[in-house]
Regions:
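Conserved beta-loop-beta/alpha segment of the NTase-like Rossmann-fold superfamily
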Residues: 1-30, 48
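Short secondary-structure boundary/capping segments
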Residues: 7-8, 35-37, 80, 89
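Solvent-exposed alpha-helices and their adjacent loops that cap or buttress functional pockets
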Residues: 9-10, 37-38, 71-72, 92
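Intrinsically disordered, low-complexity segments enriched in polar/charged residues with Gly/Pro
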Residues: 13-14, 38-39, 85-87
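Short, flexible, basic/aromatic active-site loop/helix in glycosyltransferases
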Residues: 27-51
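Conserved alpha/beta core of the MobA/IspD/sugar-nucleotide pyrophosphorylase nucleotidyltransferase superfamily
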Residues: 45-122
Length: 122
């Protein structure tokens, strides 16, 4: 269970990030239209929720970020990476662990709810 694993890892190490290995091909683009660079996926992790932190550590990190002028992090895990020196521990996630933020996410959720595992998939 992802939540229980996050809690256990956070209690042991102070941070827990849910993530899955990247399977997609990743390109880097400066303009969003063209690319001449690919990023090797073997070291990439796609983060998911939940992300679990000890409250004191998280508050201290946000205060440090504010003092350093870091204001554009997209998530707590990226903030920790930008601050540096914080080793985050990854808890295995799932492709079915989707975050609902867009209409497309809702459509994916609806499709997942309709799927019945076939016996050959077990």
């Amino acid at each position: 269970d992802i939540i229980s694993s996050n809690i256990a890892i956070c209690q042991k190490y102070g941070y827990a990030i849910t993530g899955i290995k990247c399977r997609e091909a990743i390109l880097e683009s400066e303009d969003g239209f063209t690319s001449t660079t690919s990023i090797p996926r073997d070291k990439l992790i796609r983060t998911q929720t939940p992300q679990t932190f000890r409250l004191g550590n998280l508050i201290a990190a946000h205060e440090e970020a504010k003092a350093k002028g870091i204001t554009n992090s997209v998530a707590s895990c990226t903030l920790m990476a930008e601050l540096g020196g914080r080793q985050m521990h990854v808890v295995p996630g799932s492709e079915k662990n989707i975050k609902i933020t867009t209409i497309e996410d809702l459509e994916i959720l609806k499709a997942l709810m309709k799927v019945q595992p076939e016996s050959w998939l077990k």
